[in-house]
Amino acid sequence: MADMKSIQADTREKMNKAIEAFENNLSVLRTGRANPGILKKIVVDYYGSQMPIDQVASITTPDPRTLVITPWDRGALNPIEKAIRDSDLGLNPNNKGDTIFISLPMLTEERRKDLVKNAKNYAEDARIAVRNLRKHALDEVKKVEGLGEDEIKRGEADVQKITDEYVARVESVFQKKEQEILG
C-alpha cells in the first residue's frame, strides 16, 4: 500500500507529464513568429521510412518570418517539401536546390482566433487530465490503511492543493500562448 508522500509524489509526477504534453501540443501552434516547433509533427517519407523532419534536416529561423530547412542528405529535399505541402499547416515551401525556405505570412485576425480556440481546447484537455489524476489520487488516499478520518481529509486537502497548483499552471501557460498568438 502506498503512503501519503508517495501518493503526492506520484500525483505531481503524472501532473507534470500532463503539463508537458499540453506544452508540446501548444508548441506546434503557429504564432506571429517563425518557430521550428511548428514543423515538429511533420513526418517525411525518407527512403521508405517515416522519419520526423528534425531527424533528416536542420531547421533554423534567420528572421521572425522565415524558416530554413537544410536536409543532411540532398535526396531528402523533395520528400521534405512534399511532407510540408501535404501537412495541414498551410505552408508553402520554396525549394532552392539545397535548402527549403518557408516564408510565414502575417496571421489574419480570423486565423489568430482559430489558433486561440485550438489552444483553449488543448488547455481544457490538460485541465481534464489533471482532474482525472486528482480523482485517481483521492481514490488512492482512501485506500491507505490505518488512517483516521482527519488524516484522510488532510490527504485529500493536500491532493486538492496540488491539483489547484497544476490547474493554475495550465492557465498560465495558456495565457502566455494566447498573448503570443494575439500579440
Curated annotation (Swiss-Prot):
Coiled-coil zones: none
Pfam family, one: RRF
Subcellular locations according to the entry: Cytoplasm
SUPFAM superfamilies: Ribosome recycling factor, RRF
One MF annotation (Gene Ontology) recorded for this entry: ribosomal large subunit binding
GO BP terms in the entry: translation; translational termination
Keywords carried by this UniProt record: Cytoplasm, Protein biosynthesis
Source superkingdom: Bacteria
Any one cellular-component term (Gene Ontology): cytoplasm
Cross-referenced InterPro entries: Ribosome_recyc_fac (IPR002661), Ribosome_recyc_fac_dom (IPR023584), RRF_sf (IPR036191)
Family: Belongs to the RRF family.
Function comment: Responsible for the release of ribosomes from messenger RNA at the termination of protein biosynthesis. May increase the efficiency of translation by recycling ribosomes from one round of translation to another.
Protein name as it appears in the record: Ribosome-recycling factor
